Amino acid sequence: MKNIALIITFLLFCISISAQKPNYTKKTFLVSGNCEMCKKKIEKAAKSVDGIKSARWNVVNGNMKVKFDTNKTTSDAIQSAIAAVGYDTENYRAKDEVYENLHYCCKYERTIKKE
């Protein structure tokens, strides 16, 4: 009986630890792009990052609004994922070879200098 009580206590403790409440934050940053095709690819790249709750890119002004769990990811990780599919962000420049493979209508004016 004592062992059963001990096991139940241990299991409840484990459940409470694993049920950590998400710590969501919202961030806005710029992403270069031109069209609705860009929008789909940019949002898909952002949503592929573990911990993303929402991602919306505005075609007109280039603002990317994300909501994410700070226990699982960072704004830099999200921007890096977007740059990996060919789109420059505030902090990351897409690799030239990836940018060059974008559809012709998705090739935006690159403002971030090479490092």
Where are these regions (language model features)?
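Bacterial Sec-dependent N-terminal signal peptides
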Residues: M1-Y24
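Processing junctions and N-termini across compartments
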Residues: F13, F29-S32, Y99-E100
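N-terminal targeting signals for Sec/Tat export/insertion, comprising classic cleavable signal peptides
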Residues: K26-R56, V60-N63
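Short amphipathic alpha-helices in soluble, non-transmembrane regions
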Residues: I42-A45, A77-G86
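Surface-exposed aromatic
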Residues: V59-K67, E97-H103
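Helix N-cap motif at beta-to-alpha junctions
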Residues: D69-T73
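Conserved short beta-strand edge segments in small beta-sheet-based binding/regulatory domains
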Residues: G86-V98
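Short, low-order "capping/linker" segments at domain edges
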Residues: E100-E115
